[in-house]
Amino acid sequence: MAILSDKWIREAAQTRGMIEPFEEAQRRDGCISYGLSSFGYDARVAPEFKIFTNVNSAVVDPKDFDGDSLVDRETEVCIIPPNSFALARTVEYFRIPEDVLVICLGKSTYARCGIIVNVTPLEPGWEGHVTLEFSNTTPLPAKIYANEGACQFLFLQGNERPEVTYADRAGKYMGQRGVTLPRL
């Protein structure tokens, strides 16, 4: 597998709609950076958040997820309580080529503040908004800034198309829009 450069990412975004909307240059004036980088793309977090709460004394069960465990917020600044968690999504909609796997890494600006971003790989043939998981590992409230950088995606090209892509198997998160909760 080879990591793909800014030139390849730009061409795929502009001619195949791989990333929409697409920021052709890295933006970083007075904000957490986002846009095209040398070997990746820094995506933005949309102003749509689901913050975990314990007001209903629910148990988090990935096989039977209860949406009542979350509070919906549309805001430019999301405050995650201490040692808590929030779901969000990217501003960008991704369409992953059939011979590419995408890995996501957190932004160092957030990591240095104890805020961890987790995203599973974007599989060949998948498309949708990416649901982002933010963990506040600190004993203090933490801010997430909407419409600014949240994570970096690295694009890896395989030596051939896999036998079965995410689209071929009709994966359960195919075409997701908005913040998407766990599905079984």
Swiss-Prot record:
It catalyses: dCTP + H2O + H(+) = dUTP + NH4(+). DCTP binds at residues 107-112, 131-133, 152, 166, 176. It comes from the Bacteria. GO terms for molecular function: dCTP deaminase activity; nucleotide binding. Coiled coil: none annotated. Keywords: Hydrolase, Nucleotide metabolism, Nucleotide-binding. Gene3D superfamilies: 2.70.40.10. Disulfide bonds: none annotated. The keyword Nucleotide-binding applies. SUPFAM superfamilies: dUTPase-like (SSF51283). InterPro entries: dCTP_deaminase, dUTPase-like_sf, dUTPase_trimeric. Pfam families: DCD. GO terms for biological process: dUMP biosynthetic process; dUTP biosynthetic process. Its EC number is 3.5.4.13. The active site is at 133 (proton donor/acceptor). Pathway: Pyrimidine metabolism; dUMP biosynthesis; dUMP from dCTP (dUTP route): step 1/2. The keyword S-adenosyl-L-methionine does not apply. PANTHER family: DCTP DEAMINASE. Homotrimer. Catalyzes the deamination of dCTP to dUTP. Belongs to the dCTP deaminase family. This is dCTP deaminase. It comes from Erythrobacter litoralis (strain HTCC2594).
